[in-house]
């Protein structure tokens, strides 16, 4: 069973008690793909399988599916790979009816070039979200309360920033921990963070390269958007970025249709 790690109080007196593993992980064993857990789209309850081997990202927004574990239906039949069954134009209703469908961001090739000779590519959900109606509180980022879309088990919830905007991952600092090159992960305060890769927002395919392993841990708080949403309509979710090649851990933001890891905290 999972144990808890409680952070030291920040300047606002806030603490978070984290599970010792990613949501869906079967173990905290270093180097085991069973420690990776599941991947989630921001604000969505439904999980997607992580990797069981390294995959390679292609340049044309399509992804290799090698390394994706086999998933079976109730009749013990192997289901198609998730990257091959991803759909566009997601809604809450569709996600409830089809929890195993990854709703990717739609790209449309216009065939028209811009002033620099590059093709103009449009997307239908210009926010970069997987769902047609975006909501900053799908995971309690505004209310700081557990919601019906929260995938964490009873007594736990998705971590969000506190009332003063402080991140729950401020305690994670590259120079305060140790990068484990052999097992491809980061350890600090006895807590193990494997690099899990992601499911790409454009396809639902896995992106996990052996040459540059990385991980993203979702935070239920929205990422900063542009002040001019009419011109730059992208909406984001915050996440903790863990990558060795840049020698850093930092809170960043990504499109909400991206599939990333998640680590629950005590309510």
Model regions: which residues?
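Short, compositionally biased
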Residues: 1-146, 223, 256-267
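C-terminal, surface-exposed recognition/capping segments
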Residues: 23-25, 99, 107-267
């Amino acid at each position: 069973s999972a144990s808890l790690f409680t952070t030291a109080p920040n300047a606002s007196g806030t603490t978070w008690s984290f599970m010792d593993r990613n949501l869906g992980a079967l173990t905290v064993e270093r180097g085991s793909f069973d420690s990776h857990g599941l991947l989630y789209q921001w604000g969505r309850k439904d999980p997607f399988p992580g990797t069981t081997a390294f995959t390679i990202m292609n340049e044309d927004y399509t992804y290799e599916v090698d390394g994706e574990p086999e998933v079976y239906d109730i009749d013990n039949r192997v289901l198609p790979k998730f990257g091959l069954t991803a759909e566009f134009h997601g809604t809450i209703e569709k996600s409830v009816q089809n929890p195993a469908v990854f709703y990717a961001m739609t790209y449309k090739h216009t065939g028209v070039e811009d002033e620099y000779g590059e093709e103009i590519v449009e997307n239908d959900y210009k926010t970069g979200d997987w769902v047609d109606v975006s909501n900053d509180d799908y995971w309690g980022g505004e209310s700081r309360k557990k919601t019906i879309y929260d995938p964490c088990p009873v007594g736990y919830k998705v971590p969000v920033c506190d009332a003063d905007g402080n991140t729950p991952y401020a305690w994670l600092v590259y120079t305060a921990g140790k990068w484990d090159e052999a097992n491809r992960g980061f350890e600090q305060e006895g807590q193990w963070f494997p690099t899990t890769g992601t499911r790409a927002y454009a396809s639902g395919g896995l992106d996990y390269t052996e040459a540059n392993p990385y991980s993203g841990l979702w935070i239920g708080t929205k990422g900063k958007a542009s002040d001019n949403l009419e011109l730059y309509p992208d909406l984001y979710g915050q996440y903790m970025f863990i990558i060795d090649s840049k020698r850093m851990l930092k809170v960043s933001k990504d499109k909400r249709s991206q599939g990333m890891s998640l680590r629950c905290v005590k309510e």
